[in-house]
Amino acid sequence: MTIAVGRAPSRGWFDVLDDWLKRDRFVFVGWSGILLFPCAFLALGGWLTGTTFVTSWYTHGLASSYLEGANFLTVAVSTPADSMGHSLLLLWGPEAQGDLTRWFQLGGLWPFVALHGAFGLIGFMLRQFEIARLVGIRPYNALAFSAPIAVFVSVFLMYPLGQSSWFFAPSFGVAAIFRFLLFLQGFHNWTLNPFHMMGVAGVLGGALLCAIHGATVENTLFEDGDGANTFRAFNPTQSEETYSMVTANRFWSQIFGIAFSNKRWLHFFMLFVPVTGLWMSAVGIVGLALNLRAYDFVSQELRAAEDPEFETFYTKNILLNEGIRAWMAPQDQPHEQFVFPEEVLPRGNAL
């Protein structure tokens, strides 16, 4: 009889940390959690701090906090002043010099929230990658979540990087986002941009597909239980599918003449439409950062200028855009001291 005596191989600190991070718990941490949880906490905490008591008087000449009388729809963490350029406005940097009050006044919370928010979103996408790998499924959830990340990064970071300063990014607030949308329309004619059109088609098309898919599945559910409603009538461990793909295929074949032939193609299409739309809108925003123009119908503008009786919806929208610029520039950028003489203000052909 032979007895072998040996030592268990020693485990390094990396293996110990890896086991602890991936331990089965109520809220999974994982390696992605090292990025996600601190960044999400700091971004949300910075936004709540700014909207509670930090003013935008020094950066925009506005009241933007609950302390100043704003409400949930009008509070915001505002962008720094135009004069700050693209400075990260670190608390210990040359602008604030470690003074927390001065840091708030200069708009230092905005880059703080924007950068931690971006890394928090990336951490959440990596979390979906990590958990998908651990449970043995494909990582398409993470791929889908890349679309809103692309929109966030393009709007809040890449667009102002293409402009003169962070000042031209959207502030973090509901009414502030609306102001930014008006800005994009007035200065970039964004609604006529083909990338915006693809984004709208993707988002609304995705919503339509989601509604149609949910209704079709509900219509073709098998009645395999005696529960009082849909949510009690099915056993979550049943081996067979809960709805009839064949019946759904026959229904839509009669409605449109065509239908999805299998579930894989159907669900890939539901993934493809909104994700592609959001990615295209993000590409369009990068184009706006570079001040690229799209769909300027100059021939119509020239004819409208020469012929008082000629006007199209396009030329009318161009006049509206000029009105937005003439109104918004002095209001939104008072530091530039813009003065527009009466004769340059836009007027429709009917006036």
UniProtKB/Swiss-Prot annotation:
One of its GO terms (cellular component) is photosystem II. It is a multi-pass membrane protein. Chlorophyll a ChlzD2 binds at H116. Fe cation binds at H213, H267. It is an enzyme of class 1 (oxidoreductase). It comes from Nostoc punctiforme (strain ATCC 29133 / PCC 73102). PANTHER family: PHOTOSYSTEM II D2 PROTEIN, PHOTOSYSTEM II PROTEIN D1. InterPro entries: D1/D2, Photo_II_D1/D2_sf, Photo_RC_L/M, Photo_RC_L/M_CS, PSII_PsbD/D2. The D1/D2 heterodimer binds P680, chlorophylls that are the primary electron donor of PSII, and subsequent electron acceptors. It shares a non-heme iron and each subunit binds pheophytin, quinone, additional chlorophylls, carotenoids and lipids. There is also a Cl(-1) ion associated with D1 and D2, which is required for oxygen evolution. The PSII complex binds additional chlorophylls, carotenoids and specific lipids. It is found in: Cellular thylakoid membrane. This is Photosystem II D2 protein. One of its GO terms (biological process) is photosynthetic electron transport in photosystem II. NCBIfam families: psbD.
